[in-house]
């Protein structure tokens, strides 16, 4: 392969670049082309580097959320044997309906029956 076809090495980002990218991700998980161009000029990165950073960051978030859900399911299974008889039918229905949502609260919060909103 000629020099144009060689694979590029892994990009390392400065703390400042990472901080700015994380701040942007917090507000926008997806960037418009215009915003990507602005960031590339501000952070001295290419548009492609920014695009790939955001793709990787979204995948990291997806994996983290999935891991938390799996841990919550394990905890629900463990606690189900001890607290299964203490659950009312409405709390079981509520937990199963909300299990696919974005809430990442521990399962004990769902079983308490009281919330700060009440």
Swiss-Prot record:
One annotated Gene Ontology cellular component of this protein: nucleus
Lineage: Eukaryota, Metazoa, Spiralia, Lophotrochozoa, Annelida
One of the record's GO molecular function terms: DNA-binding transcription factor activity, RNA polymerase II-specific
Organism (species): Hirudo medicinalis
Family: Belongs to the Antp homeobox family.
Pfam families given in the database record: Homeodomain
Highest taxon in the source lineage: Eukaryota
DNA-binding region: 6-65
Compartments, as annotated in UniProt: Nucleus
Region spans: Disordered: 81-118
Annotated keywords: Developmental protein, DNA-binding, Homeobox, Nucleus
Biological role: Sequence-specific transcription factor which is part of a developmental regulatory system that provides cells with specific positional identities on the anterior-posterior axis.
Coiled coil region boundaries: none
GO biological process: anterior/posterior pattern specification
Biased composition regions of type Low complexity, renumbered to the chain: 85-96
Protein name as catalogued: Homeobox protein LOX2
């Amino acid at each position: 392969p000629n020099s144009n076809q060689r694979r590029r090495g892994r990009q390392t980002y400065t703390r400042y670049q990472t901080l700015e990218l994380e701040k942007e991700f917090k507000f926008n998980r997806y960037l418009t082309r215009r915003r990507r161009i602005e960031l590339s000029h501000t952070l001295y990165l290419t548009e492609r580097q920014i695009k790939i950073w955001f793709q990787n960051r979204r995948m990291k978030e997806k994996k983290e959320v999935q891991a938390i859900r799996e841990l919550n399911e394990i905890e629900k299974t463990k606690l189900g044997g001890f607290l299964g008889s203490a659950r009312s039918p409405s709390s079981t229905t509520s937990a199963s309906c909300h299990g696919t949502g974005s809430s990442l609260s521990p399962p004990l919060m769902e079983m308490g029956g009281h919330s700060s909103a009440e």
